[in-house]
Design a protein with these regions (language model features):
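Extended, charge-enriched "interface" segments that sit outside catalytic cores
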Residues: 1-42
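Glycine-rich phosphate-binding loops that contact phosphosugars or nucleotide phosphates
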Residues: 28-36, 43-183
Length: 183
């Protein structure tokens, strides 16, 4: 079924409707960030996007953004996949929270490494900005829609990963949001 993510077939099956809706939401978010319609809490244009995930939620998107960096937009991509606190801290030191979007990518939204990193980033963000502004700066990609809301992410900023999408194929769908934003 993962081939449905790459298909240009416009039949009206349930799967293709789900794929079309997800791709449409990705395009909207990407376009809004790149054209300045979606801004940070302070009204400043987004300059950085950070993908927080491991395995298929990280490797494919990082590979594609690196491979196609020649075609990059003005938004700079970062990837947090390592649980080492120094690794995450070094990335955060180089970012302005006012101009950064964070994408938490976890199919179940229970992946320990991803959630630990997301909690570190959230704590840093709240310390430097405030909790209310999470809604402007955090996006979740998951098939679990409830836990991201508890994290503070608004429904409109939650993109689904269908259960039938395996990790290595996930970059063709919502896991590839950072690709859509940056390339």
């Amino acid at each position: 079924l993962h081939t449905a993510l790459r298909s240009k077939n416009n039949d009206s099956t349930i799967i293709s409707e789900e794929v079309k809706n997800t791709l449409s939401k990705m395009k909207t978010i990407s376009d809004e960030i790149n054209n300045g319609a979606r801004v940070g809490h302070s009204g400043k244009k987004i300059e950085n996007v950070v993908n927080i995930g491991i395995g298929g939620s990280h490797l494919g998107p990082e590979m594609v953004t690196e491979a196609l960096s020649f075609y990059a937009q003005s938004i700079k991509p970062y990837f947090i996949s390592n649980i080492d606190p120094d690794y995450t801290e070094n990335i955060l030191k180089s970012l302005n929270p006012d101009t950064t979007i964070f994408i938490i990518v976890s199919k179940t939204f229970t992946t320990i490494e991803t959630l630990e990193n997301a909690k570190k980033v959230r704590k840093w963000f709240v310390k430097n900005v405030n909790e209310e502004s999470i809604k402007n700066h955090f996006i979740a990609v998951s098939n679990n829609t409830e836990d991201p809301k508890e994290f503070g992410i608004e429904s409109k900023n939650i993109l689904s990963i269908p259960e039938w999408v395996g990790g290595r194929f996930s970059l063709w769908g919502s896991v590839g949001l950072i690709i859509s934003i940056c390339i």
